[in-house]
């Protein structure tokens, strides 16, 4: 029997899951975490960054968007003793936010993968694995210019 975790976001009432990624400054994937949509970004961001910090102890700071304010910022600054830079959207019009753009670009590269374009996976572990495989495929294509 297959169990599918379903949850709705508070704002958009969308069923599915969220992906949190940690990238380096060039947009290369360091860590990925997938969870149901009913968990807030600032709470799950703490778990994601702590896991990334254990894998990569040289991490000194993090740039995050406005959804990670509050709990995440306090936890990373106090408990993990890392720098946090929250990049907020500007109220007037559309503009490129350089630090945030790195992660958005990585997500768009990953969404080019057919398997990630929709939420086909049942478990969050297999969803995370598909993200990693898609990134490996992307890196190999760039390495060999295919």
Model-inferred region functions:
Residues 1-83, 88, 134:
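Polybasic low-complexity intrinsically disordered regions
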Residues 20, 70, 74, 80, ...:
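Basic, amphipathic alpha-helical segments enriched in Lys/Arg and hydrophobic/aromatic residues
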């Amino acid at each position: 029997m297959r169990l599918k975790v379903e949850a709705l976001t508070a704002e958009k009432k969308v069923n599915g899951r969220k992906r949190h990624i940690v990238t380096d400054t060039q947009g290369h994937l360091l860590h990925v975490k997938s969870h149901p949509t009913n968990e807030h970004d600032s709470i799950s961001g703490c778990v994601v960054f702590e896991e990334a910090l254990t894998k990569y102890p040289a991490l000194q700071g993090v740039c995050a968007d406005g959804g990670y304010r509050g709990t995440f910022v306090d936890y990373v600054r106090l408990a993990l003793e890392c720098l946090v830079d929250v990049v907020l959207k500007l109220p007037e019009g559309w503009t490129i936010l350089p630090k945030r753009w790195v992660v958005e670009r990585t997500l768009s590269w990953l969404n080019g993968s057919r398997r990630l374009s929709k939420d086909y996976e049942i478990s969050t572990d297999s969803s995370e694995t598909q993200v990693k495989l898609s990134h490996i495929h992307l890196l190999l294509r760039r390495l060999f210019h295919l």
